Every structure is written in C-alpha cells, then in structure tokens.
Curated annotation (Swiss-Prot):
It is a multi-pass membrane protein. GO terms for molecular function: ABC-type glutathione S-conjugate transporter activity; ABC-type transporter activity; ABC-type xenobiotic transporter activity; ATP binding; ATP hydrolysis activity. Pfam families: ABC_membrane, ABC_tran. ATP 1 binds at residues 634-641. Residues 599-825, 1255-1488 form the ABC transporter domain. This is ATP-binding cassette sub-family C member 10. The lineage of its organism: Eukaryota, Metazoa, Chordata, Craniata, Vertebrata.
Length: 1501
C-alpha cells in the first residue's frame, strides 16, 4: 500500500503522503485529500438529485443565476481535461507525477459534469423557482481550498518568474480560470431566486389530474438510498402544509392498492389458507431480504473487531502505516455499508408489510361483501380490521429476527469460546435453562392475548351498539347501566392485559439479569477448571457477554410477536372461512320454466343458520307472474321479512330451489329498517347511478319527497348524517324507496315501506309509486296496513314461517284485519280498529338537526387534527393518568438502576487500576504510572459491544496496591456481584412499577373517555360519525394499552442511559464534552426537521383510519341493499380509495423514519471514522496516545448509538402520544349535558316532587343556532295530571322538539318547563328522566338476554318481566328463545322488527313513571295485535299522564285533548270532538284529508 501510494505521489515509501512540503501543504495531499475526495462527494450528492421529479407545466424560463451556475459547472468540467494537455510535456513542466494528475483531473471532470446534469434536473423541477438545495451548493465550494493551495504552490515554485515555460504558465492560467468559474458559480448562487413554486402545483400533490409523479419510482439508486426524493414532502412538513392525506406523495406502483389487489387475487381463492396466498404473492421478495439482513448482521461485527485492531496498531506501533489506513478505511466503509444495508433492509421489510397489509385489508373487505347469513358482530369485524391485521403483519419484522438473533448469539459465543475455552458452556447451559421458563411465560402470554382479544371484541361490539342507540339510552337514563357493562368488559380486558404486562416484565427482567449471572458462572467455572483469571480474560468475557444482551433481550419480544401474529392469523382465517354468499349455488341456474314468470320457489326450506337450528321458512310452491303486485301479510314474527330475505339470497337454502328471471339485473330492495348512507339525499337516491334529471324528478314525485326537500336547508344536497340521523323515520323509508325505484329493476321487494308514514303519504306512495312508476314491474309488498292491498293481484298469508294461503285480496285480507272494511263507514272513524292518520304528519326525529345544518347542507364536519408538536398538556395528562406518585417512583427506580449500573462500571475500572498498580512494570503496561494509560486495557477489550456499553471510568489508582492473587479476584468478583445484584433488584422494581403505571394509565384514560362520551349531548352524536368514536375506542385505546408503554419504556431507558454515559464522559474525559454541543445541534436539527413531518403523517394516518372503519360498518349494515342493487364493485372501489389514502400516510411515515435512521447512522459512522482518521494522522506524527484513542473511539461508538436510539424512540413515542392526544381531545373537549344545581330541600323534594304528573310549558323558545328560525316559538300549554294528550302537526312543526325539551336532551333558549310546578332546569338530569318514560318509534335493543334488554338496571323481579311480556304478546316468543336468559343477538337481530317494537313497549309497561311519552311505536305490528296493545296501554296507564305523537287516529281521537302545532307554535288545543266540530280548524282539515286518503285506497276495486 505504501509503495503504491509512494509511486502515485513520487515520494519516499517511509512518508508516502507528506502533509507539508516547505511552507505549504504537500501537493499529493492536496490533490488526493483536498481535491479528489471533495469532488467525489460533490459527484455523489449531485447524482442524488439526478432523479428530481420534473414539473408538469411547461419548462420555466431560466433566471440569470441558474444560467450562470450551469455555464460555470460546464466550464469546470472542461478545464480539468484541458489541464491534462501539458501533462504530455517534459516532467519539469508539471507540478506532480503523471498518474496523480490524470486521477485528480478525471475525478474533477466527472464531478462537475455530474453536477451540471443535476443542476439541469433541478432547473426543470419546482426547485427552479428558488436557489435549489443548500447542501449541493456548499458541496460545490468544498474543492476551492485545493485550487488556492495549488496556486500558492505555483507561486512558491516561481512559475511566474522568467524564464516563463508554456506548460506551467498554461496550467496556471487554467487554474485562474477555474477559480474565476467557481467565483461565477458563487455569484450565480447568490443571485436572488424567486419564491419557491408552491407545492400545491407539484405532481406530488393535490388533484388526481396533476398527480403524475410517484414517490420513489423513477429515482436514481443514490436518491433511493439517501431518500432525497422525500425532500419536498419534508419541506412541506416544516412549512406546516401537511394538512390532508393528498398532501403526501403518491404511492409507488408496487404499493398501490389496485395493483396489489390484482397481484394477491392471482394467488387467492375462496377457502384458501391466507398465509399461503401471502407467501405466494410476496414471499419470494420477503425471503430475499433475509440475505440483506445476514450481510448487515455480519458487517455489524466488523466495527468492534476493526476498532480493536486499530487500537492494537496504535499501541504496538510496529505494523506498517498501510495497515492502519486499511483499518480506518475498513472501519469507515464497513460502518457505512452496514448502516445502508440495515436501513434498506428495514425499509424494504416495511414495504413488504404495507403490501401484505393492503392484501389483508382488501381481502377482509371483499369477504365482508360476500358474507352469508351467519355474520359475526360488527365490532368483531372492526377489530379484525384495526387490531388483528396490524398484529398479523408484525410477523414481517419478527420472522427474520427469529433466525438473525440466534446467528448473532452463535458468533458471540464462538468469540467467547476463544477467550475462556470450555468454561463458556456453563453460561450457555444457564441461558438454555431459562428457555423452558421463557416458553411457559410465552404460552401464558399467548393464552392471555386470546382472552384479551375476546374481551376487546365484546367491548367494541357493545360500544357500537351503544353509539347506535344513544338517543334511547338517554331517554331511559341508561348511561350508567350500559356504561357499567362496557366497564365490565374493559375490566376483564385489563385483567388479561395485567397478566401480559407483568409476564412481559418478568421476561425482560430475566433476560436483563442474565448477562451478569452468566459472567459470574463462567468466571467461577474457569477458576474451578484450574485456570488463573486475568484482567484480559475478565474484561473480554464481560464485553462479549454484554453483546449477548441484544439477542437475548429481543428474542422474547420476537417470539411474542410471532405468537401474536399466529393468534390474529387464526382469527382472520376463521372469518375468511365463514360461509359466503354465492348466487350461483343459491339460485337455480335456469330461469323459471314459463317466460311470463318472474319468480318461482318450489319445496324451498330456508333458515338463518346453515343447519336449520333457528326458525325456518318453508314455501311449498310460489309462482309470481311478471308485472304482478303481490301482497304479503301475517302476524308479527310470522316470516314475512324472511321470505323477502330468502328471495334475495340472504338466508341459507336447505332444500328446494329458487328461480328468478333476469337475475343478473338484481332487485329493487327497500328493507324494513331503511339503510341510509352518510351522504347527501341526492347521492343516497342515485346510489352510484348516472344522474338522469327526468327520471330523478319522477322518482322524487312518486316518493312524495318534493315537500320534504323544500323544507331542508340545502334541498337534495343536504347531508343526512350517519344512518340518516337527521331524517324522520318516514323520510328515511321514502328515500330508501326512492333509491330502489331509481335503480330501474324488474323485480321489487318492498318490506313495509308504508309503516312509518301517515295515511295520505302512504296513499301517495301506493298510487304514484307502487301502482304508478313501478306499475310495469313485478312487486312483492309486505305490510300490516292491509287497506292498501286491495289493489294487489294476489296476497300471500304467512304463519309461523310457512306460506299457508294464497289468493285474491278479498279472500285473504279479512283473515288478518281487526275490523273488516273499516273504511266503509265514514262516521265510525273514531271507534273502528282501522287506523287512518293525519295528512303529512310523520314524525321528524331530528327536526333540530334539519334546522341546525348550514345552508350548504353540510352536517358532518371534517375530523379535526392537531398541528405541531404534541402539546405538553398531553404528556401531563398521561402523567396524571398514570398517577403522580407511581410516575415519580418509576423515574426514581430508573435513576437507581442507572446509578448501580454505573457503579458496577466504576468498580471494574477500580479493579483494573489496582491490578495495573500491583503489576507496575509488567510488559502489558510499562507506563502504569501514567494517568493517561491507566485504562489501557478497557478500550482494547471492551470494544466488542457496539452500543449501550459504558467503558470503565479512568480512575486514579488508590494508594493501596493490590496483588493479582486469587483471593483478590474473588473479593472483586463478590463486590461486583453484589452491585450487580442491587442493579438487578432495581431493574425488577422498575419493570414492575412501569407495568403497573402503564396499566393504571390505560384504565384511567379509557374510563375518562367513556364517562365523557356518555355525558355528551345527542347533538354531538348526530354530527359525529360513529367510526371516529370507534376508532378511538379501538385503535387509539389499543395503542395506549400496548404500543405506547413499550416505546415509552425504551425512551426512558435511553434517556437515563445517556445521562449515565455523560456522567462517565464528564469524569473520565472532560475534553470530549466539547464535541457534544455541535453534535447535539446537528442531531437536534435533523430530528426537528423529521419530527415536523412525522407527527403530521402519524396524525393523518389516524385520521384516515376512521373512514375505513365507518365504510366497513356502513357496508355491513347495508349488505342486502348493496348486493340487491349490484353495487358491491363500487363499494369495493371506494374501500380501495380510502385504503390508498391511508396507505399513503403509512408509507410516507415509514419512509421518513428510514430517512432519519440513515442520517443518524451515517452521522455516527462519520464521527467514529473521523476520530479514527485523526488518530492515524496523530500516530504518524508521533502524537497519538493509544489508550486515549481507544477510549474516544469506544465512547463515540456508544454515544452515537445512544443518541440515535434516543431520537428514534422519542419520535416514535411522540407519534404514539398522538393516540393519547386524540383520547384527551374527546375526554376534554366533547360538550357535556348541563348539570343543574340541586333543589333547595334535596331529601324531601327529590322523593316527592313528582306525585301527580302535570306538565306545563311556559313560553318555551328553542333555537338551534343563532340566525336560524325558532324550532319552538313561545309554546305554552298545560297538561293536567292523568290527562291523555295527542300531539299532531306537519313535518317540522316541532313535535319531536317538545319531547327533546321535556327530557332536556336539548335546553330551551327561553321559557321553562314545569312538572308538578317544579322547573325542570333545576333538576339533575337523572332525577328528571327517572320520572319520565318514552316508547320510541324505532326500537333499540342491544346484544344480550331478554332480561338485560327489558331491565338493564335490574330493578324488577322475573314475575313482573313475564307479566310485561304477556301483555305485549311476546311470552311465547320468549319461551321459544329460552326464557328471560335467551340471547337476542346484535341489535336484537333474532327478533323481527315488529317483535322488537313489542319488546320496547314491554319496557315501558315496567316503568313507574308518572308521565309517559309515546311516539307511535306499533307501526310494524299487524292490526289485531295493535288493537290489543292499544287496549293494554290504555289500561296500564289509565292514571298516568300520557303524551302521544300521533300517527294513527285511534291514538288521537281517544285522547282527552289534542295539541296541534304549526311552525313551532301552538295553534289549537282542545278535545278531539270540539276540534272536529270547528269547520275551519286545522285539525278538521287534516282529518278530512286523512279520510280521503283512506277511501282512495280501495276506490278502484
């Protein structure tokens, strides 16, 4: 090496690279070190910018600065080549040897040519509007000192003095021209550039039409390795422009969901094993990364080994210089290559993880679209999407570690064998003995994990139901009861989590304490084998055993990750193995035999479960001709809806066959419970179909929606909220019907669309829609309002799941009507069992929200997102949640743990100094009295640990010199073992305390969130999609439970580790602390630049999860409608679009993590390499102190590793704290229902304040938002105790607002409400609602038993429950389901809609409330049952005050008085007979129109 260098430079082999020649630097040193190396760096940096994405618009005009820089760069690439021409002249005319000049000139020319190309690329990118990257410009000036020094060299050589030789003079002229070109380049860079082009026009951003560039694709390999392509994204993050998912860069082609779905589907088929399909799709690429992992792992050992060799070279001083140079270059190169390889490995593994993630999530959604009748609860499916998919994909990071860590272990053990021989087996046996212990722990963790996930499923499912029925829960004051159920699930979940956390703590403690125990065991064995312990053996063994910490500590986590992946894989596989909806297998492949037949069923038996255990539906034979109107009637729960579900394929067909004509065109389906999307009314009706203005107008008219749209603030552009929350029941039914009609199908299945509307609207729907627009189609209509079936072609009578009669209406209808032909007698309206109702009086469930919406019609606001660093109050909130005392104890235990660890290091240093003092003059330390060399062994022997290794302190030898006898060794070992034991106890204490603190924080944060949300007003839920709330209860809570404590633990360990290292540095080598400020500044700048983007990307990632949750929940709710309309493909595309937005944020956050990692790694490598290089130069000058150099190198290695870990763990912890921030946002900022002051005499008045039941409204005004019209405008009336009051009025008249104000779900702006002369605003909400009862129009049931649904608070005996069921005609159903403990299923799915309404009525029968509010709750029951129920209500509540929002006239005309509302005012209040006798009363007009509606039904018969 020296010879080659001497030959290249023309120097002596003893000094091949002289630093000084005369009064200036050596020419060879100048050309190689000061010129060639900076030019090589310039070439590399320039190459990184060659792939800079171009702008999409036309090329901008070059400003003068860019032109000057381009021209200067091009000239600087030409001049070195011209400079080579004088080289051919005689030797005297050139300053250095031939090949040195050729090498330097070629490197310079290539560098500037590459730089010219890079500038050209930057000019045509958004950088063209500014000066471009600063780093690139600074690199261009790095070679300038070499030019200046070469010019000085010429001056010293007298090149300008006569005789002037043409060769040297020409070279000087070219040198001056090069300096001038560099100056011109500087002026070009200094010229003012315009403001940087806004990135909103960048192809990385904004609308799809402009997004032509894709992240990473098309970039150079240098740009990929350095992540230079991320610069625009990071710049936007620093400027605060990462506001929405589209602000991130587009996905590379290999990560796009559409591409990945195609790749995965090629290997996936129904019933296949998920892991096999994933392996076939992505396995080869993933396994190939193992090679990268292995090379990176092997190179990881090069650093410590080469450092040891370098210290040996400096210490011995006998090896040639070339060896030292090779060690330094090997150290630098090995560290850099290892950093790049390991970084690329991490990046590629994350990319494979993202690929598999899209495949899994797409497959889950596709399966959800194909689910058969046996469907898991929505909460469980959401958990598969949020929790299990993430845990499954942790496999990607764990698998390669599972073999990589044992490889590191094997290499370390081999090196240990080299030091202590067979004694290392004693330590190995001890380590192996802990494996079965670890196996037991891992098995317990896995079992607890499965149980915890089951409890989590139950909790999320319960929350889903709770959110869907929050209005009824508040009416019935069940917040406490259902909140307790959620808390019970959470307690069970935390119980399993507690087991997991403490087992994890035990696992970590065992492996953390293991190295010390292994060391002591090895040393004792070594002595017993008859060997003499020496400092060399002790410290080398300690260093090597410390290298075992990483693989031994990480291995349990890796195994745990693999086990968790297996658990989640099994859960996902079970979901994927559920029976699928298969039209090909369900329907007969042949159409009906007769062309005129639309539908035919023969000997068909159906059930909701595949084995027929639930109620069956049997159709012996049914043939429906094309164009017929078929009515389906029967008692509640007889199987009417099941028949329609059987036709649409939503049941299991056990036998027989079903044939449908033109099956591929699908069905027009209007379900009994209307399914409405969170979108505008127009979007709900169009349902993905192209807008046809003429057809759209016809559909609106046919479905009687024009009047409703004229009331709504933005017409058909009004957003209706999740599940149509801002609409009345009738409006939802009509929009669902309009959606079906707009699809223009041949076969329509209409499940009771007339139940929720009044007689006039029902009449309109019958004549304009069912008999009008749909007259040319085949229609099957289920209804209890039999008066509207007189025009049917045929009527089917269902009973107990069987089709018992088929015939014309005149035969079938009398069998089910309460009073036949009730419409025949006009004068018997008041007493007949028929139910005429008031024109256009359907209830508006959410009148307040209809008004509350802004004129743009937008109800649901974009989810808010915090910006900037995670605020300090979030950390304080987590501290408080953990408990101040517990948090302080954790910090104290951490500091004690670090102090004892440093104490152990100090004791080792003291032992070494005593050994060296006792062996003064030995060959190993001829200068033991020198303070600088007292720790000579420590750097040499402790360099094997690449991180978190604290080299012993440089301690002054004590006055007492110790011998190296065995007794002394034993003494030092005992003291060391004692200190290590104390450290072990502190470690255990810290692990246990931290587990307890994490559990306390998890419990506290969830409790606060749940309590706050249960106390939120209904307006919050109406404007907040449930997906947002569920996202917090699922993903964010899971993060607080698991991910955050794990990362916070690492952060705290790194922090106290850094404090301990700084303490060692400050006492051992104080001058080294001078390097910390600049190093800290660089680290802080890099991580600050990174954190600004990563924070926002993490938030955007959380933000884009919520729509995925909502979309999946929405899909599961509307599955029959989707499939009937053939919209599954469109919904799958929407899922891919939402998934792409989330994938963008995930990919960008992963890429930014790797961007930070490579920079921190390279900075650490640069620090170590620079110190090694300086040491080599000092060694050549005879100034190096080997011991000091070794210390510096080992400290540098530990310090950079710790700083990297600290930045990384802090950033990831901050990202996880976003989950705490989101929980705190809802725990603190969600509005709360008002809490009133207690009454003056709480004991007496609270018991007896409502004894009679009078209700009085006094000038009540309700305004939902300033500037909007009054919903209630000075309403005044009084209801006497025991009085029955009917409430009627048109849509938007304020009927529902009365109930909302009465129950204080909304607070009035003026006026007051009195109950028995007590102002309700002075009462606590629970106190008020406990005295009121409500029967809602829409039934709400939650999963659980009949008992839990009837009496959630457990206040009544079984006898009372059975009595209520008997009165509601549900006792037989309850017995068939297994009595009061029979399960109802999710949202009561085991009951028909009518049976659910009856069960809600049974609740009201149990109440002791003095005031009952009824919102016509029997719309979905047959007329005979309805008549009996009305009699039951009249009898049961005879002495109670009853307020009824009327839909059927029998509930009004039997009332004592009727209240008529119009535009929020009371216009009439009198008895029904008095109002009917007033010829111009509004009530009389409504009554007349309702009678006309009733008569028009059969008029055509």
């Amino acid at each position: 090496m020296e010879g080659l260098l001497a030959q290249l430079c023309g120097t002596d082999a003893a000094r091949p690279l002289p630093l000084w020649e005369g009064d200036t630097t050596g020419h060879c040193f100048t050309q190689l070190v000061l010129s060639a190396l900076p030019h090589a760096l310039l070439a590399v940096l320039s190459a990184c910018h060659l792939g800079t994405p171009r702008t999409t618009n036309h090329s901008p005009a070059l400003n003068p600065g860019w032109r000057l820089r381009l021209a200067a760069s091009f000239l600087l690439s030409i001049f070195p080549l011209l400079d080579l021409l004088p080289v051919v002249l005689p030797p005297g005319s050139r300053p250095g040897p031939l090949w040195l000049e050729v090498l330097a000139g070629c490197v310079t020319a290539v560098a500037w040519f590459t730089h010219s190309l890079a500038l050209w690329a930057l000019v045509h990118s958004p950088h063209g509007r500014s000066r471009g990257p600063l780093a690139l410009a600074l690199a261009a000036f790095l070679p300038t000192p070499a030019l200046v020094l070469t010019l000085l060299w010429h001056c010293q050589r007298g090149t300008f003095l006569p005789p002037l030789l043409p060769g040297p003079l020409g070279r000087v002229c070219l040198l001056i021209l090069q300096l001038a070109a560099v100056l011109a380049y500087g002026l070009g860079w200094a010229a003012p550039g315009g403001p940087q082009e806004p990135w909103t026009h960048d192809p990385f951003l904004s609308s799809e039409s402009q997004e032509t560039e894709v992240a990473e694709d098309g970039e150079s390999w240098l740009s990929r390795f350095s992540y230079a392509w991320l610069a625009p994204l990071l710049a936007r993050g620093v400027r605060g422009e990462l506001q929405q998912p589209r602000d991130t860069c587009r996905l590379p082609r290999r990560l796009h969901p559409a591409f990945l779905a195609r790749v995965f589907q090629a290997h996936w088929k129904e019933g296949a094993q998920l892991w096999r399909a994933l392996y076939r799709a992505f396995g080869c690429c993933y396994l190939a990364l193992g090679l990268l992992k292995m090379v990176g792992t092997m190179l990881g050992f090069s650093g410590p080994l080469l450092l040891s060799l370098l210290v040996g070279f400096l210490e011995e001083g006998q090896e040639p210089l070339s060896h030292g140079l090779l060690y330094v270059l090997g150290l630098a190169g090995g560290t850099v290559i290892s950093a790049v390889l390991q970084n690329q490995y991490g990046y590629e593994v994350r990319k494979v993880t993202l690929q598999a993630r899209v495949a899994v999530l797409s497959t889950l959604y596709r399966k959800a679209l194909k689910l058969g009748p046996s469907r898991p609860p929505t909460g469980e499916v959401l958990n598969l999407l949020g929790t299990d998919s993430e845990r499954l994909l942790n496999f990607a990071g764990s698998f390669h570690e599972a073999w990589g860590l044992p490889l590191q272990l094997a290499i370390t053990l081999y090196l240990l064998y080299q030091q202590v021989g067979m004694a290392f087996l004693a330590g190995l046996v001890l380590a192996l003995l802990l494996v079965p212990v670890n196996k037991v722990i891992a098995t317990r963790i896995m079992a607890s994990n499965q149980e915890m996930l089951r409890h989590k499923d139950a909790r999320v499912k319960l929350m889903t139901e709770l959110l869907s029925g929050i209005r009824v829960i508040k009416f019935f004051r069940w917040e406490q009861a259902l909140g307790d159920r959620v808390k019970a699930c959470r307690t069970k979940e935390l119980g399993r989590l507690r087991v997991i956390k403490y087992l994890d703590a035990a696992c970590v403690y065992l492996w953390a304490a293991l190295p010390v125990v292994i060391c002591i065991t090895i040393f004792i064995t070594y002595v017993l084998m008859g060997h003499q312990l020496t400092a060399t053996k002790v410290f080398t063994a300690l260093a090597l055993v410390r290298m075992l910490i990483l693989p031994l500590n990480n291995f349990p986590w890796v195994i745990n990750g693999l086990l968790e992946s297996k658990v989640s894989l099994d859960r996902i596989q079970r979901f994927l193995d559920l029976p699928s909806y298969s039209p090909e297998a369900y329907y007969s492949p042949d159409p009906p035999a007769e062309p005129s037949t639309a539908l035919e069923l023969h000997e068909a038996l159906f059930s909701w479960d595949p084995i027929g255990a639930s109620q069956k539906t049997f159709i012996s034979h049914l043939q429906v001709k094309k164009g017929m109107l078929v009515g389906i009637v029967g008692k509640v729960g007889c199987g009417k809806s099941s028949l329609l579900a059987a036709i649409t394929g939503e049941l299991h067909r056990l036998c027989g066959w079903v044939a449908v004509s033109e099956l591929s065109k699908g069905f027009g389906l209007a379900t009994q419970e209307p399914w409405i999307q969170c979108a505008t009314i127009r979007d709900n009706i169009l349902f993905g179909k192209t807008f046809d203005a003429q057809l759209y107008r016809e559909v609106l008219e046919a479905c009687a929606l024009n009047d409703d749209l004229s009331i709504l603030p933005a017409g058909d552009q009004t957003e209706v909220g999740e599940k149509g929350v801002t609409l009345s029941g009738g409006q939802r039914a009509r929009i669902a019907l309009a959606r079906a009609v707009y699809q223009e199908k041949a076969l329509y299945l209409l499940d009771d669309p007339l139940a929720a509307v009044d007689a006039d609207v029902a009449n309109h729907l019958l004549h304009r829609c069912i008999l009008g627009v749909l007259s040319h189609t085949t229609r099957l209509l289920c209804t209890h309002r039999t008066e509207y079936l007189e025009r049917a072609d045929v009527v089917l009578l269902m009973e107990a799941g069987q089709l018992v009669r088929t015939g014309p209406p005149s035969e079938i209808l009398p069998l089910v009507q309460a009073v036949p032909t009730a419409w025949a007698e006009k004068e018997q309206v008041a007493t007949s069992g028929q139910s005429p109702s008031v024109c256009d009086l359907e209830r508006t469930t959410e009148e307040e929200l209809e008004v509350e919406q802004s004129t743009c019609g937008c109800l649901v606001q974009e989810e808010s997102k915090s910006e900037g660093a995670v605020a300090l109050h979030v950390y304080r909130a987590y501290w408080r949640a953990m408990g101040s005392g517990l948090a302080a104890a954790i910090l104290v235990s951490l500091l004690l743990m670090q102090a004892t660890r440093n104490g152990a290091d100090w004791w080792l240093a003291h032992w070494l100094s005593q050994l060296k003092a006792g062996r003064n003059g030995s060959r190993e330390d001829p200068a033991s009295c020198s303070p600088g060399s007292t720790a000579l062994f420590s750097p040499r022997l402790l360099l094997f640990s690449p991180g978190n290794l604290y080299t012993p302190l440089l301690s002054t030898p004590l006055h007492k010199a110790a011998s190296n006898g065995t007794a002394d060794v034993h003494f030092y070992l005992i003291v060391y073992a004692t200190i290590a034991g104390v450290n072990s106890l502190c470690t255990l204490l810290r692990a246990v305390l931290f587990a307890a603190g994490a559990l306390q924080a998890a419990a506290s944060l969830h409790h606060r969130l749940l309590h706050r949300l249960l106390m939120a007003p209904v307006t919050f839920y109406d404007s907040t999609p449930s997906g947002r709330v569920l996202n917090r209860f699922s993903s964010d809570v899971a993060c607080v439970d698991d991910s955050l404590p794990f990362l916070l633990n690492i952060l705290l360990a790194n922090s106290v580790g850094l404090l301990g290292l700084l303490a060692v540095l400050g006492s051992g080598l104080p001058w080294l602390l001078l390097l910390l400020p600049p190093l800290s500044f660089v680290y802080y700048s890099v991580q600050g630049y990174y954190r600004a983007s990563f924070r926002e990307l993490r938030r955007l990632g959380s933000l884009t999860w919520s729509p995925l949750y909502s979309h999946l929940a929405d899909t599961l709710a509307g599955l029959p409608v989707l499939r009937a309309a053939g919209a599954t493909y469109r919904f799958e595309e929407e899922n891919q679009r939402l998934l792409e937005l989330n994938q963008r944020c995930q990919f960008a956050s992963y890429a930014t993590m790797q961007w930070l990692d490579i920079r921190l790694q390279l900075m650490g490598a640069a620090v170590v390499s620079a110190i090694a290089g300086i040491a080599l130069v000092q060694h050549q000058q005879g100034l190096a102190n080997p011991g000091l150099v070794g210390l510096v190198l080992s400290y540098a290695l530990s310090l950079t590793g710790l700083l990297s870990g600290l930045v990384s763990s802090f950033t990831q912890t901050e990202a996880m704290m976003v989950s705490v921030e989101r929980l705190e946002e809802y725990s603190c900022d969600v509005p709360q229902e008002p809490h009133s002051q207690p009454l003056q005499s709480p004991h007496q008045q609270r018991i007896s304040w409502l004894t009679q039941g009078s209700v009085e409204f006094q000038d009540v005004v309700l305004v939902y938002r300033p500037g909007l019209p009054n919903a209630l405008d000075g309403v005044t009336f009084r209801v006497e105790p025991g009085e029955k009051l009917g409430i009627v009025g048109r849509t938007g008249s304020g009927k529902s607002s009365l109930f909302l104000v009465l129950f204080r779900l909304l607070e009035p702006n003026a006026g007051r409400v009195l109950l028995d002369n007590v102002d309700t605003s002075q009462l606590e909400l629970a106190e008020l609602r406990s005295q009121l009862a409500v029967i809602p129009q829409e039934p709400f049931l939650f999963s659980g038993t009949i008992r839990e649904n009837l009496d959630p608070q457990g206040l009544h005996e079984d006898r009372a429950l059975w009595q209520a069921l008997e009165q509601c005609h549900l006792s037989e159903v309850a017995v068939a389901m297994g009595g009061l403990d029979g399960e109802l299923g999710e949202r009561g799915q085991n009951l028909s809609l009518g049976q659910r309404q009856l069960l809600c009525l049974a609740r009201a029968l149990l109440t002791d409330a003095k005031i009952l509010c009824i919102d016509e709750a029997t719309a979905s029951v047959d007329q005979k049952t309805d008549q009996l129920l009305q009699q039951t209500i009249c009898k049961r509540f005879a002495n109670k005050t009853v307020l009824t929002i009327a839909h059927r006239l029998n509930t009004i005309l039997n009332s004592d008085r009727v209240l008529v509302l119009q535009a929020g005012r009371v216009v009439e209040l009198d008895s029904p007979s008095a109002l009917r006798n007033q010829p111009h009363s509004l009530f009389q007009q409504l009554l007349q129109s309702s009678q006309q509606g009733a008569h028009s039904g059969p008029s055509g018969c």
